[in-house]
Amino acid sequence: MKSGFVVRSTISSWESAERFCRQFSLPLLDMQAKHNQEVFQLIFDHQNVHLLDCRAKKPLTLMVDFVTGSRDHRRKFGGGAGQAVAKAVGVKGNRTLHVLDATAGLGGDAFVLACLGSRVTMIERSPVAYALLADGLKRGLLQAEEAGDDELLAILQRMTLVPNDGSDWMRDQLASSDSEQPDVVYLDPMFPEKSKKALAKKEMQIFQEVVGGDEDADKLFEPAFALAKYRVVVKRPKIAPLLNGQEPSVQLVGKSSRFDVYAKKKLPE
């Protein structure tokens, strides 16, 4: 079950916050306004957009950062094409793929694929996830440009974010006569965990509390398989049931998660 949140903004970020709230039909409060003490606050300020968990004495903050921290470390030392997600998608050598990530979340796997040369179109329906990811991309592009980091700049330029429901967006593409067919459709729907212990990182606990599990995830499979040119890849917790009950062509099983690969035809060399 999803928890409620409020959107708050400083004066310096009011215009972008107001634009976001209009897009998703959400109310906007300034930083001094009283509210109903919602546990979570989505904050727009001059530095970034972040999600604030107000329950602890020291509030916990969740934001997207492609420039420093764990994502920067993974970009530099993550194992390249040997990573499980890369193997499942089919990243290999100089092969350049267009990947549709129909459940982008906070963009972690999309970033890995973009680091390995793929062009990634990300679809995200949650207003909170979209706001955090869009801000992370915007800041990342600015910081990479300012630092003269051409490699990171090129990576982030290969990532495109669209606010929409993944299933609806794919069906619209199938109905369109001039849409581009992605080589691979990647699905990582939020699996409703029954305990917080199943979510190792505190940040992911917060994220799932606000976004909620994708209870309707099964509806993603049919349009994904119809739209993908070569394969559909589904990331699931290791013990989770198959998406839509569909048997995969092959499975890559890790310690806590697995990748179910549904092949349509062989990827080009």
From Swiss-Prot:
Alphabetized, the UniProt keywords read: Cytoplasm, Methyltransferase, rRNA processing, S-adenosyl-L-methionine, Transferase
Q: What is its EC number?
A: 2.1.1.242
Protein function: Specifically methylates the guanosine in position 1516 of 16S rRNA.
What's the main place this protein lives?
cytoplasm
Location in the cell reads: Cytoplasm
What does UniProt list as this organism's lineage? Bacteria, Pseudomonadati, Pseudomonadota, Gammaproteobacteria, Cellvibrionales
What top-level class of enzyme does the UniProt entry assign? transferase
**What domain of life does the UniProt record list for this protein's source?**
Bacteria
Question: Which reactions appear under catalytic activity for this entry?
Answer: guanosine(1516) in 16S rRNA + S-adenosyl-L-methionine = N(2)-methylguanosine(1516) in 16S rRNA + S-adenosyl-L-homocysteine + H(+)
- Cellular component GO terms, alphabetically? cytoplasm
UniProt: S-adenosyl-L-methionine binding residues: E124, R125, D188
**What Pfam families is this protein classified in?**
SAM_MT
So what family is this one in?
A: Belongs to the methyltransferase superfamily. RsmJ family.
A molecular-function term among this protein's GO annotations: rRNA (guanine-N2-)-methyltransferase activity
InterPro entries membership:
16SrRNA_methylTrfase_J, SAM-dependent_MTases_sf
Recorded protein name is Ribosomal RNA small subunit methyltransferase J
Q: Which organism is it from?
A: Saccharophagus degradans (strain 2-40 / ATCC 43961 / DSM 17024)
